[in-house]
């Protein structure tokens, strides 16, 4: 996908760039596959902020995506490639031979008119879904299940791709985009290819208002707050944090403190941790 640059008519458009939509099909989303989702604004059921700096943003209709790919042995045809405001990746509409329609994540290189299938014996072609046990080593994959039958949970953002590097016993070894190397059941389903919209991270927001359109509010530094609001707050003028090391707003160690649970069930399955920073 191309990147469209703005001319510097205003300070907001100077250096601003957005993604082009040439490969997308101009169409309305399928009504049966969309529904209204209430915007929580970062609050829980009691109205307490649980995720800071969220709120506002443009209204969105949620598109129901088929992450399970459980439509077995029935081929489908790609009819549209559409924009999805709820994720960085684009989506495509699949018309199956039995008349059903579903949205899936758009793999890079898949075009309107192409045919895909989900099957245990599916050919190794872009967009096809099959278990890891039937894939050759070195295959590029995305939308990978952690628990077989639960639906894809790994590698689902724009431009993401994982690699199948080994198979032994009941487990397959994957190299994830983060650099993490982990084990997954060979019965887990995955989709062939890399997710499209690879230039999603290369665009420049350009102005604060564009962040507000996305529902993201200003991220305030703790050092400019009052002492009641943050451990770093207070002091006269530009004061240091006054602590031995940085802390979170709730007084816990920040910046470098590992937050992963020591007894998490998947620890034995991770052979190499992801890169930090």
Swiss-Prot record:
It is found in: Plastid, Chloroplast. Belongs to the universal ribosomal protein uL2 family. Keywords: Chloroplast, Plastid, Ribonucleoprotein, Ribosomal protein. GO terms for cellular component: chloroplast; mitochondrial large ribosomal subunit. InterPro entries: NA-bd_OB-fold (IPR012340), Rib_uL2_dom2 (IPR014722), Ribosomal_uL2 (IPR002171), Ribosomal_uL2_bac/org-type (IPR005880), Ribosomal_uL2_C (IPR022669), Ribosomal_uL2_CS (IPR022671), Ribosomal_uL2_dom3 (IPR014726), Ribosomal_uL2_RNA-bd_dom (IPR022666). Part of the 50S ribosomal subunit. This is Large ribosomal subunit protein uL2c. HAMAP family: Ribosomal_uL2_B (MF_01320_B). It comes from Physcomitrium patens. The gene is rpl2. The keyword Aminoacyl-tRNA synthetase does not apply. SMART domains: Ribosomal_L2, Ribosomal_L2_C. Residues 229-246 have a biased composition (Basic and acidic residues). The keyword Ribosomal protein applies. One of its GO terms (molecular function) is transferase activity. Pfam families: Ribosomal_L2, Ribosomal_L2_C. GO terms for biological process: mitochondrial translation. Residues 226-249 are annotated as: Disordered. Its main location: plastid.
């Amino acid at each position: 996908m191309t990147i469209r640059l703005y001319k510097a008519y205003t300070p907001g458009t100077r250096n601003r760039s957005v993604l082009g939509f040439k490969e997308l099909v101009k169409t309305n989303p399928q009504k049966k596959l969309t529904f209204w989702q209430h915007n929580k604004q970062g609050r829980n059921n009691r109205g307490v902020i649980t995720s800071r700096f969220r709120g506002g943003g443009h209204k969105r209709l949620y598109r129901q995506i088929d992450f399970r790919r459980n439509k077995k042995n029935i081929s489908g045809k790609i009819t549209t490639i559409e924009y999805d405001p709820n994720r960085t990746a684009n989506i495509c509409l699949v018309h199956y031979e039995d008349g059903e329609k579903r949205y899936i994540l758009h793999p890079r290189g898949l075009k309107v008119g192409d045919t895909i299938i989900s099957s245990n014996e599916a050919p190794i072609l872009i967009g096809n879904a099959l278990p890891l046990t039937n894939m050759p080593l070195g295959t590029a994959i995305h939308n990978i299940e952690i628990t077989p039958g639960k639906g894809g949970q790994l590698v689902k953002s724009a431009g993401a791709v994982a690699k199948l590097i080994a198979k032994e016993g009941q487990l397959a070894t994957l190299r994830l985009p983060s650099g993490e190397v982990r084990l997954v059941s060979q019965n887990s389903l995955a989709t062939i290819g890399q997710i499209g919209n690879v230039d999603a991270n290369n665009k420049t927001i350009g102005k604060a208002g564009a962040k507000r359109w996305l529902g993201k509010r200003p991220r305030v530094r703790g050092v400019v707050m009052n002492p009641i609001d943050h451990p770093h707050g207070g002091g006269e003028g530009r004061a240091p944090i006054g602590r031995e090391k940085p802390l979170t707003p709730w007084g816990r160690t920040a910046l470098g403190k590992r937050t992963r649970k020591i007894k998490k069930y998947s620890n034995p399955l991770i052979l190499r941790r992801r890169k930090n920073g």
